[in-house]
Amino acid sequence: MSDLTRLTISQARAKLRGKEITATEITEAYLSAIDRANPALNAYVAVTGDRARDMAKASDARLVKGEGGALEGIPLGIKDLFGTEGVHTQACSHVLDGFKPLYESTVTANLWADGAVMLGKLNMDEFAMGSSNETSYYGPVINPWRRSRLDTVVMPTTHQGDGGFVSAGGTKTQRSLDNAQLVPGGSSGGSATAVSAFLCAGATATDTGGSIRQPAAFTGTVGIKPTYGRCSRWGIVAFASSLDQAGPIARDVRDAAILLKSMASVDPKDTTSVDRPVPDYEAAIGKPIKGMKVGIPKEYRVDGMPEEIEALWQKGIAWLRDAGAEIVDISLPHTKYALPAYYIVAPAEASSNLARYDGVRYGLRVPGKDIVEMYEKTRAAGFGREVKRRIMIGTYVLSAGYYDAYYLQAQKVRNLIKRDFENVFAAGVDVILTPATPSAAFGIADEDMAADPVKMYLNDIFTVTVNMAGLPGIAVPAGLDPKGLPLGLQLIGRPFEEETLFQTAAVIEQAAGTFQPEKWW
């Protein structure tokens, strides 16, 4: 039997329903792959093998009877931000040591109701704060992609018997992999690595400023951040409540559409979830885009953008034009203010949300001589450096002397960013095409990034506007850089028009193809 982990969700779904394979077989294949690869990649922080086998067995029983949901028997990885009843849920933070919730997040409950199988919990940046998956208490996730290089190899002169001439030697070039470890992006780095390295069929993720789309672009996978309110946030550990949104990371556009259909729902437990029908996103794939108006924002041509990113963008424009779309130049004038405004709003909300972690009822507790010292010691030991930095920023901008100067101004900028998009869509633009990231994946422990947090924050330059405006955005693989690393393009849509994103992303995918890392782990 061929490697079952190589099947896409749509392929596995067909084989499961056709009784060509069983849920138990494909689940065991993934558990074996995780066992072999996770020591090298660190994608999973908890593997739920026994639960996965029980869920697969139950799926097989339903499939035998011709029953089963939309994801029956499909093995998935779950980002450690999603509450999973009785299972490790720590947001990859020391402060939540040993926490196993008594509840199930709405998104994961939807997946289990549709028959999905849980393989385990995936690594991530601590409390989803990061763009490289290096802030996790459990250590960095390793990108399964590596840079490749051309080596010149000297060929020996060889002879055969009695001086018979075979080869005159000389040189030849061959491509080989660099050993340098790369980041998978963040905060959903474990999700992206697990999908890219065939350690799950698909994964849940969350996106507050680009945490689905940037890792997807860095790993050659597809990631969609749906419209704010499309998926329930109930049971998901909060970072910035007005920006957080759950979505899937998958191997191709169709798989992402299948997953989002199951993840999305209205939820009375989340007042920000929106009560509107969830469409059949998969049905949008393959529809022509002839006559669709695609906007190209001039403000996304940033200083110092690498040539390969601009070239990729132009290639994407050509693909959509060739498919019959009308390309129009647009302006989103407040784009340049999005990143500084985001890094005021998000930390402000985080400082409020993270105030609840005090060591009293659950998680880490470091004793002190009184309750105040216990709070101080617990939070000092429990939170990592980046989380502390953002709590301090948030507390500062919310303080009495600076609230008007920073937080209030940032919220005004947010409204202007939202209005920019509204004006463009009102003018008839159907979808906006931009790069997903300003570069390909960079190295683990990059000295420039470590020395200047702002450089790390700039990884979100193309993605934060989408969160600030509450819009849907999808990252789709579109090519490789000169060193063989994946690059992605981003599509931004009107509110609740994820179908248009899937429809357009499928055109890019068909033109660009799909990308898989060369296995080294």
Curated annotation (Swiss-Prot):
Molecular function GO terms recorded: ATP binding; glutaminyl-tRNA synthase (glutamine-hydrolyzing) activity
Q: InterPro entries, alphabetically?
A: Amidase (IPR000120), Amidase_CS (IPR020556), Amidase_dom (IPR023631), AS_sf (IPR036928), GatA (IPR004412)
Coiled-coil ranges from the UniProt annotation: none
Which Pfam family is an annotated match for this chain, by its short name? Amidase
* Gene Ontology biological process terms, A to Z: translation
**Active site at which residues?**
K79 (charge relay system), S187 (charge relay system), S211 (acyl-ester intermediate)
Give me the reactions it catalyses: L-glutamyl-tRNA(Gln) + L-glutamine + ATP + H2O = L-glutaminyl-tRNA(Gln) + L-glutamate + ADP + phosphate + H(+)
Presence of keyword ATP-binding: yes
GO cellular component terms given for this protein: glutamyl-tRNA(Gln) amidotransferase complex
EC number(s) given by UniProt: 6.3.5.7
**What keywords sit in the KW lines?**
ATP-binding, Ligase, Nucleotide-binding, Protein biosynthesis
Q: What does this protein do?
A: Allows the formation of correctly charged Gln-tRNA(Gln) through the transamidation of misacylated Glu-tRNA(Gln) in organisms which lack glutaminyl-tRNA synthetase. The reaction takes place in the presence of glutamine and ATP through an activated gamma-phospho-Glu-tRNA(Gln).
Oligomeric and partner information: Heterotrimer of A, B and C subunits.
Annotated family: Belongs to the amidase family. GatA subfamily.
Q: Would you tell me the protein name for this molecule?
A: Glutamyl-tRNA(Gln) amidotransferase subunit A
